From Swiss-Prot:
It is a multi-pass membrane protein. This is Synaptic vesicle 2-related protein. Residues 1-87, 144-156, 202-209, 260-316, 395-401, 446-457, 511-548 are cytoplasmic. Keywords: Cytoplasmic vesicle, Membrane, Phosphoprotein, Synapse, Transmembrane, Transmembrane helix, Transport. It comes from Mus musculus (Mouse). The chain crosses the membrane at residues 88-108, 123-143, 157-177, 181-201, 210-230, 239-259, 317-337, 374-394, 402-422, 425-445, 458-478, 490-510. The keyword Ligase does not apply. Residues 109-122, 178-180, 231-238, 338-373, 423-424, 479-489 are vesicular. Residues 521-548 are annotated as: Disordered.
Amino acid sequence: MEEDLFQLRQLPVVKFRRTGESARSEDDAASGEHDIQIEGVRVGLEAIELDDGAAVPKEFANPTDDTFMVEDAVEAIGFGRFQWKLSVLTGLAWMADAMEMMILSILAPQLHCEWRLPSWQVALLTSVVFIGMMSSSTLWGNISDQYGRKTGLKISVLWTLYYGILSAFAPVYSWILVLRGLVGFGIGGVPQSVTLYAEFLPMKARAKCILLIEVFWAIGTVFEVLLAVFVMPSLGWRWLLLLSAAPLLLFAVLCFWLPESARYDVLSGNQEKAIATLKRIATENGAPMPLGKLIISRQEDRGKMRDLFTPHFRWTTLLLWFIWFSNAFSYYGLVLLTTELFQAGDVCSISSRKKAVEAKCSLACEYLSKEDYMDLLWTTLSEFPGVLVTLWVIDRLGRKKTMALCFIIFSLCSLLLFICIGRNVLTLLLFIARAFISGGFQAAYVYTPEVYPTATRALGLGTCSGMARVGALITPFIAQVMLESSVYLTLAVYSGCCLLAGVASCFLPIETKGRALQESSHREWGQEMVGRGTNSAGVPRSDSGSQE
């Protein structure tokens, strides 16, 4: 086979339109046409078998034909009305996720008093949600890769809506424990909205738009606190659970408009559906479709865990798992630490305060006051500066450096908490730390869907989300249990963990800034041919992504 390929020695210069990932680098010439000297004797391309056993697609038999891939169409159509609608719709799912998470800090103390629950049962009510999320994240990613992004997202949202509403009618503790665990199981699939959303975005708008739906997370947390301020004193926690499901209900009503990812359709061989979706986007945006024939990527197994550990992605997967673990571990740890630090006034007062306080009955409780809700509100508002900072730097520094910057600044703020400082400085440090650790989360949500190919994108994001839930499960034992014995050791654990995450971000093999979304885990055969020609004839080659 190699002899056949390299016998192409005496053919004249041909001109063809470059397609696929190699044509979509930001540094490519605008024309997209290149002269390549091919020498040798023509052979029948349709019958050639590549080294990996993949037949050459017939679409490439005549290289002068106009062809395009989904990425080319998305770039040509651009950002418009369709993407704005999609932003709002996927943002609703993200907002609902934030509200279901924020309600944990409101529901737990209420049930602690109303049902006279011991402290360990209150803690279990929070932990069971994270257990559900951790156990389902990989499953939802697999479903989205196997059966479609739209299918996985719709099922997870409807699942969460159903059990979220049932939670409001739970008669006893055991019922609400099971139902909230099932809610957590459904929430584990909501991050797949990022996968679907990213696959419809042109390259230059992708980072900003993914950060845009992260704003919906911040809006959801603020809205949940405001809702609790007005609902809890008069109507109670059952009505709060019902009203908190409103964004999910709205999504369920509007999801009939949601299209399936054209990238997924192409990868699964549904060319007609992919073209129909692209034409629909072009019509809504008032933009023309690219001329030519849509190239169907070679079909391959989707949603296989082993694909995350191929030589090309093994190191990336392991580093991302640690980064996501550290992110959630530190984010939720800071949320828990904030209450303790505010109550004590500063770090130096915590140990003495805990020694002075007599042991209390585990059934003793206090309902949240309006002042408590306002403190929660001010804390959640720190999410917005994190979005703004990440939005400003992510396309300037790149994804890897942005994550590293956020983790390192959080680590420094944690170390500064060792100093005996006043409440005002304490508040400032906590807000800066919260802003940057949330910014690290946002940057990770941009990077992860970009680095994996379409065949494993949902699974990759799902497994990373699952590792984040492991961090969220562990962090109460550090922020609450370890804090009882040593506040300095607790702060050192969070600071050290994020410092290591910053180093891990720098060691990620691939920088995705200015890089097109990869359609397949294998190179397109056209790229393979150009690569071989480069080695033998010195023709320059454009990579679709940079590796450092």
